[in-house]
Amino acid sequence: MYPQGRHPAPHQPGQPGFKFTVAESCDRIKDEFQFLQAQYHSLKVEYDKLANEKTEMQRHYVMYYEMSYGLNIEMHKQTEIAKRLNTILAQIMPFLSQEHQQQVAQAVERAKQVTMTELNAIIGQQQLQAQHLSHATHGPPVQLPPHPSGLQPPGIPPVTGSSSGLLALGALGSQAHLAVKDEKNHHELDHRERESSTNNSVSPSESLRASEKHRGSADYSMEAKKRKAEEKDSLSRYDSDGDKSDDLVVDVSNEDPATPRVSPAHSPPENGLDKARGLKKDAPTSPASVASSSSTPSSKTKDLGHNDKSSTPGLKSNTPTPRNDAPTPGTSTTPGLRSMPGKPPGMDPIGIMASALRTPITLTSSYPAPFAMMSHHEMNGSLTSPSAYAGLHNIPSQMSAAAAAAAAAYGRSPMVSFGAVGFDPHPPMRATGLPSSLASIPGGKPAYSFHVSADGQMQPVPFPHDALAGPGIPRHARQINTLSHGEVVCAVTISNPTRHVYTGGKGCVKIWDISQPGSKSPISQLDCLNRDNYIRSCKLLPDGRTLIVGGEASTLTIWDLASPTPRIKAELTSSAPACYALAISPDAKVCFSCCSDGNIAVWDLHNQTLVRQFQGHTDGASCIDISHDGTKLWTGGLDNTVRSWDLREGRQLQQHDFTSQIFSLGYCPTGEWLAVGMESSNVEVLHHTKPDKYQLHLHESCVLSLKFAYCGKWFVSTGKDNLLNAWRTPYGASIFQSKESSSVLSCDISADDKYIVTGSGDKKATVYEVIY
């Protein structure tokens, strides 16, 4: 009559029955809560699987779009070739005898009659050849029908050469990875079944469904990776190899639409030292760069005629940037695409859709911007339960106990460990390319700092207890002023003592007095280079009386700031069309300039002459720093190398090779450590003698500038992801993080370590006060 699970009535005197105790009720509530928690966890896992599946489907869509676009181009190309050959034949035929003319005309007509049977036979033969090639390379292939759906393809226009080759390549790629994919699926299915058998709270049907979804996601993932590699190879034919480092441009992403564009050679800076195509003969361009406020994937145009912002097809690079439909917390999404007539070498233009193939699709966060400037100490109360956070994010925990203890001692909140801008919905994706076992530490806190040993072994860094405490370590930074420069700010520097800030944009440097709160206009403007050329670097001599400016021109301008009105004291002319970075020796006698041709020019400032050139970089030299004692120089280049130079002997000392272009670097004033900012979004901290290094993973896109504090205990980096990150030297504990509204291209720290200035793509510089 009553349900079996009905709770017993309270015990009354004189009646036999169970004793009512609070402990039993609490246990029952606890059991029910654990059951609900397990159900919630399984639903969360299923939701994550579906989200991953959706991501992979979107990538597949992009991949097929890219493939169809490529085939369409190839078809038009082959059609045009056929028309031209026809014209040539028609012109040559009259020179033949009458008899030969008829034979040739008949042969031409026969050649035009390609039937579907012949076409299918040709495709079948190509697939057979692909199978033989696959057999020779990867062992016996898995049989594959001529068409992915098992049907014969519909009529295709008769094409020759590389178009049919592309079809064969597709068939080969599909067959080559099927066997590997199936084997991996079996392993993963077994693993999921073993996992589900140990989970009492999930029903068998749920386990089976989860394993099926897991296998489907693995299929998508393997296929997407393989197809990305195939597309990169097959589409590279559309690119020429002529792109070199002097073709670097700046994209003013926030420029008013009504403003007429200047010559294509002076397009504004896009983030990440992107190289431009076809601009070599027009003008030097340069490596810093600027992005849109919504961090849309940058684009590269093949044709200068398509240099319009809103219509340029193309793609940026392998750097992960958020999709336009998923704005980062605290930023406003700007409609429209930001075009960028530049690219790093080896990137292939096929359409803006292609960039999503190389771009993780992020989900929006529900956490707003105010978290951006909170210190980690203030954030530690958020979601401190390790099991709650691990359950929420389905995070694997295979880290060492030492790392766990260190993380607990460090006390970094889960939210801040992704940057104080909200949760990352897929923590293991945060550290790009890392195995899932390295993506988090016990307790569900994602790792972002890793120690890389000499043999390449990567381990999360256990932070010491004083990682965020102690003398000279800031707690956070607060924004105190905004300097509206009016153009993209590619270079900033602060005077010593801290009073003036110099901001370099298009064709001029503006001087601001930050000692007066609320100052909204510059006190002076230094017009240099050409009006449309961007300034890439400006450096003050230690006495504060001389400013050296370099950028998209072959000349460096030396300004005398001590005169009643600043004036040009001298100009230094080099053979390179652009200067990307400057450094001044501690004794202020020598200036070093990074040239777009890869050379490092050494200038005697007293005699205003070129005294030496360091040659070694095979592509543009993009960044530079000098040791505190003035004996060693460090340079980074677009040739993926960092080199050190002995200034006394004038020779190269060391060379570090990377897999990514180098956009920024800084040498610790106290010696030993060199921090390097990559196009791949990593920051790497190298020891000047030991092979060990640290790898830091909080940026989501190109790391565009980097600067050490003068005490050497911390440094800051800025990126295309709109972030300013402050790191502990050398292991990279995140001290604080600030989110700006656009790409942050440049930064500087005052000599007393009390102020930070950044220059960004939304035409302003921002002054921060460092709070200790």
UniProtKB/Swiss-Prot annotation:
Ubiquitinated by XIAP/BIRC4. This ubiquitination does not affect its stability, nuclear localization, or capacity to tetramerize but inhibits its interaction with TCF7L2/TCF4. Ubiquitinated at Lys-720 by UBR5 in response to Wnt signaling, leading to substrate recognition by the segregase p97/VCP and degradation by the proteasome. A motif (Nuclear localization signal) lies at residues 225-228. WD repeats lie at residues 484-522, 530-569, 574-613, 616-655, 657-696, 698-737, 739-771. The modification Phosphoserine is found at S203, S207, S211, S217, S240, S245, S263, S267, S286, S317, S413. Residues 184-196, 209-247, 272-283, 300-309 have a biased composition (Basic and acidic residues). It comes from Mus musculus (Mouse). The modification N6-acetyllysine is found at K232, K275. Belongs to the WD repeat Groucho/TLE family. It is found in: Nucleus. Residues 197-207, 284-299 have a biased composition (Low complexity). WD repeat Groucho/TLE family members are characterized by 5 regions, a glutamine-rich Q domain, a glycine/proline-rich GP domain, a central CcN domain, containing a nuclear localization signal, and a serine/proline-rich SP domain. The most highly conserved are the N-terminal Q domain and the C-terminal WD-repeat domain. This is Transducin-like enhancer protein 3. Residues 310-322 have a biased composition (Polar residues). Residues 130-163, 184-347 are annotated as: Disordered. The gene is Tle3. InterPro entries: Groucho/TLE_N, Groucho_enhance, WD40/YVTN_repeat-like_dom_sf, WD40_repeat_CS, WD40_repeat_dom_sf, WD40_rpt. The modification Phosphothreonine is found at T259, T312, T319, T321, T328, T334. There is a cross-link at K720 (Glycyl lysine isopeptide (Lys-Gly) (interchain with G-Cter in ubiquitin)).
